[in-house]
Amino acid sequence: MSNSLRGPLEGVRVVELATVVMGPLATQILADLGAEVVKVEGSELDRSRVIGGGRHPELSGAAVNLHRNKRSIQLDLKAPEGREVMVRLLESADVFVTNLRPRSLASLGLDHETLKSSMPRLIHCAAQGYRHGSGEEDRPAYDDVIQAETGLADLSLKVGDTARYIPTLVADKVSALMLVQAAVAALWQRDARGHAARVELSMFDAVLAFHLVEHLSGATFRGGDAGYGRILNAKRGPHRTQDGLVSVLPYADRDWYELFAEVGREAELLGFPFRSERERHENADTVYSGLASVLRMRSSAEWMRLCAARGIAAAEVVGIDEIVSDPALHRGMLIDDDHPVAGPYRRIGSPFRFDGAASAIRSQAPVVGEHTIEILYELDYSEAEVEALIRHGTAGREAVAQLAPENR
């Protein structure tokens, strides 16, 4: 597979020793930006390879997207020979991305302190649940746990009767995005100033920084309350029209006038609490009730036409099954593709463009160890050495087989 643009990170080599979503998503973004990514895998299957089902035991719905533009090498890192391969691989790399806990990294000799003297240009990016040096860095942490501990789950309790997790892997994905930002900044610093940084990212810190942008709110100044009241109002959400659900966000005074005037209720805007933006924000419960009663008086299509004509932000509520099946709704972000092993699938498009062009999709997601032999030769192992590593189980190679025609 090819595209006219490889990406701004072309020439950067990234080694990934990571599982589930946070680490693999970060390296997938780096790969989409043009970096060469080598995914190091062991005998235990990365959990991301089974998320979302699929036709092949190693290529789930999540895996075919999370691991695109990567190569895979399978190594036994507990064996000295496997660690030696890993060291050679890291010596050839610019960035090392891992979400192994510090104790595990140290036991493998892959911690920053061990590697820095022999690899002074390697940017060591370690992402765990909790901050290094906190005493909690070796605690297990997954998305649900971080949502609970950072107060995200409690926010839903403030608008309903039950504490709930946000129904997407927000902690993993926010942390992945921040890790990418830090890795790219570290690359710039190394090339501009000659210093290869150790990058550390805590999921807890990332998610807390993410949601406190608005929810620190009054607690920014001691004595106030945390939580952004308008967002935490139980009546905030899509509203019913005569025939469906819509999201309509009037912000400016003029927006409110256009909506209320459409149903002959503009006089209400002269009284409390509609007279100013501050008044509306401080009395969100009453304001949302008023907006809901107005929107019930017309059909969804009528409101969409009015809002489009008046420049008011609005959309109909789209079902998840609808958006993944209708190109007009997903706006070209899902692309029909064909994997040589997993068969036909829908690929998630790249959300960014450079000079109007999408990032290149250079290769499909590999099965475990698909590129083991290829990479060993690149690291100057001889044919006899490669055969010995494979024979002893230190390095693994997955046989790549086509799906039977009935599964395609």
How should these model regions be labeled?
Residues E44, G129-R131, M203-L208, D243-L245, ...:
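Glycine-rich beta-alpha junction loops
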Residues A176-A196, A209, V213-A219, F260-A267:
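Oxidoreductase and adenylate-handling cofactor-binding alpha/beta cores
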Residues M1-A192, G290, V367, I373-R408:
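N-terminal helix-loop segment corresponding to the beta1-alpha1 unit
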Residues A309-R362:
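A glycine-rich dinucleotide-binding beta-alpha-beta segment and adjacent secondary-structure elements
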Residues A234-R310, A314:
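Aromatic-enriched alpha-helical interface/lid elements that frame and gate functional surfaces
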Residues V50-G53, L216-A226, D326-H339:
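Short, surface-exposed loop/helix-turn segments at secondary-structure junctions
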Residues H132, G160-V170, D191-V207, D225-I231, ...:
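Conserved Rossmann-fold dehydrogenase catalytic segment
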Residues L270-E282, V317-S325, E385-R408:
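Short linear loop/turn motifs
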